[in-house]
Every structure is written in structure tokens, then in C-alpha cells.
């Protein structure tokens, strides 16, 4: 059985209102109103440099058992893991808001091949205030760290699936026609990603107890509930008012927080899905096994 022996996150307790962020970025009241309509209220932002927080998070990992490291970043920036041991490191980037799923796919296959523990580090930060605020949404800070193993697995990875078809390749500066094409096709492409992932392991959508999605705003998941014919209350977005979106890592935070709050129980099968603007998508299906952290 392969999966996460340990999966943990570090999210700031410092919550900044979207009013403060919109004012700092000199954005309009219309944009603020759209953010509120999408369910956003506060965004978690580290007061310290995220690299310092990363070191604190990594201090909880026993590196003597780690034989490989995958670093997943949508927008790459230099980080120093300050390792005492020599451990092979692979860094992947791109696929904004979906890269963590590719990191899991890579790390899981690596673990299966060498039968040794692999560390996944998923970390992103906005390089400026205008990069934090994006298309009526706002990005919060988080660090996700997981140890993939075939021993003492707590979160069994059943399947991962990543795909891309890029409609708008320059973000909010893309041609308006490309942006509109992306928005028209996005719900169906998210559904296709989910269905293809389920097919890999011969599951149906009704086998999934909860969907934990990317959370730029609520409206996309109101639509997806209808597109998937899946209960909206089982598409878990209740924490969005204190997270906004967390790049590729928000679905994992929502999942782990739901475990902490007793919503997810042993044996539950969940689907975590991230849809990036422009045309990248990733999803991971997990069975919660429970056990030691």
C-alpha cells in the first residue's frame, strides 16, 4: 500500500482582510464586491519569510529515512532545504494551481520504484501584491509537506491524474477571446479530469464521499455540482472565508482540516481537485486510513 505516512501543513494564523489587500493593490470596489460574492473574507499571510517557516516545518521530518525529495512550485523561487544529508532533489514547476498533484504523481512513482520514503514539498508564494490578487480571487500562504511511503500509510493514494489544454497562456493578460474560451470549457474539462481519474481505478463518482476542491471562489463549484450531478454539500468549500485559494495546496488543506474536525473518518474515499486558470488540472484520490501522524 502506497501513500502518505505523514502529511502536514503550515498555514499562517495572521489573517488579512480582503478589504486591506484590495486597498493596498489599488483595485476597485467592484473587484472587492466580486471577491465577497465569491465567499472571500480573510487571507492567511505569513509575517515571516516563507523560507523561515519552511525550515520550522521540515524540522518535524526524520530525514534519515528520506531517499528522495520532490519540490513542487507553480512559480519557482530559490529555496534552501539546509539538508545535512545528501539526498537527490527534483524540482518541478508550472501548471499554476495544479502542480502539487503532478508532484504527488512523480513522488509516488519514485517511491514505488525504489521502495524507500520520498518527501514532497509543495510551496508557493506570490512575488507581489498583484500576483496575490488575481481574477476576483486572492491567494493565501501555505506550506504542504508529505512523506510518501509503503509503510504505516495514513493517507492511501488510490490514483492521481494531471492534464492540460491551455486556452489562455498569459494569465489575466491573455486575449479576452482566449479567456472566454477557457471559461466556457473549464467545467467540462474539470469533469473530464475527474472521470478519467476515477476510471484508472474502476471507481464511480458515487464511491467518493467528499470532493475537496481548489477554492478561488464559490461559484465554480456551484456549477460543478450540477455538471457532475454530485451533491453540493459534499463539495467541501466551507473554509474559503479564511483561506481564499492556496495555489495548488488548498484542496489538501481543506482535506486535512476536515480530518482534524472529525468530518472525514477512516475508510472515507475523497477526491482532491485543482483547476488552474488557463487550462491545467490535477486531481488525487485518497482513502483515509488513519493511524499515527
Residue spans of the language-model regions?
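Stable alpha-helical structural segments in soluble proteins, enriched in small hydrophobic residues
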Residues: 46-62, 99, 103, 107, ...
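Short, well-ordered, mixed-charge alpha-helical segments that flank or form enzyme active sites
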Residues: 78-79, 98-101, 126-130, 166-169
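Conserved beta-ketoacyl condensing-enzyme motif
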Residues: 45-95, 200-221, 227
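Condensing-enzyme catalytic core mediating Claisen C-C bond formation in acyl metabolism
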Residues: 1-44, 130-188, 192, 196, ...
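Short beta-strand segments
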Residues: 5, 72, 119-124, 272-275
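Membrane-interface helix-loop-helix junctions at boundaries between adjacent transmembrane segments
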Residues: 114-117, 130
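Claisen-condensing/thiolase-fold acyl-transfer catalytic domains that form or cleave C-C bonds
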Residues: 76-77, 86-115, 135-137, 151, ...
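Acidic/glycine-enriched edge-of-secondary-structure segments
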Residues: 38-52, 92-93, 181-183, 244
Amino acid at each position: 500500500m502506497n501513500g502518505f505516512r505523514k502529511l502536514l501543513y503550515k498555514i499562517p494564523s495572521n489573517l488579512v482582510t480582503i478589504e486591506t489587500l484590495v486597498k493596498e493593490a489599488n483595485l476597485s470596489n467592484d473587484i472587492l464586491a466580486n471577491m465577497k460574492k465569491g465567499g472571500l473574507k480573510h487571507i492567511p499571510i505569513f509575517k515571516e519569510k516563507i523560507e523561515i517557516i519552511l525550515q520550522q516545518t521540515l524540522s518535524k521530518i526524520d530525514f534519515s529515512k528520506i531517499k528522495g525529495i520532490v519540490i513542487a512550485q507553480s512559480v519557482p523561487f530559490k529555496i534552501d532545504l539546509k539538508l545535512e544529508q545528501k539526498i537527490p532533489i527534483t524540482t518541478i514547476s508550472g501548471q499554476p494551481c495544479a502542480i502539487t498533484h503532478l508532484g504527488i504523481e512523480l513522488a509516488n512513482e519514485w517511491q514505488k520504484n525504489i521502495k524507500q520514503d520520498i518527501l514532497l514539498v509543495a510551496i508557493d508564494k506570490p512575488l507581489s501584491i498583484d500576483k496575490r490578487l488575481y481574477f476576483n480571487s486572492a491567494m493565501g500562504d501555505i506550506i504542504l509537506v508529505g512523506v510518501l511511503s509503503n509503510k504505516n500509510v495514513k493517507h492511501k493514494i488510490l490514483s492521481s491524474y494531471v492534464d492540460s489544454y491551455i486556452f489562455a497562456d498569459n494569465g489575466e493578460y491573455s486575449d479576452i477571446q482566449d479567456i472566454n474560451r477557457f471559461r466556457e470549457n473549464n467545467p467540462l474539462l474539470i469533469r473530464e479530469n475527474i472521470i478519467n481519474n476515477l476510471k484508472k481505478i474502476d471507481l464511480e463518482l458515487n464511491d467518493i464521499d467528499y470532493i475537496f476542491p481548489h477554492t478561488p471562489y464559490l461559484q465554480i463549484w456551484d456549477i460543478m455540482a450540477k455538471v457532475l450531478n454530485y451533491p453540493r454539500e459534499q463539495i467541501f468549500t466551507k473554509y474559503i472565508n479564511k483561506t481564499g485559494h492556496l495555489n495548488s495546496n488548498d484542496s489538501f488543506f481543506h482535506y486535512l482540516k476536515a480530518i482534524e474536525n472529525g468530518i472525514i473518518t477512516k475508510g472515507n474515499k475523497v477526491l482532491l481537485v485543482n483547476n488552474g486558470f488557463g487550462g491545467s488540472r490535477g486531481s488525487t484520490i485518497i482513502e483515509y486510513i488513519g493511524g499515527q501522524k
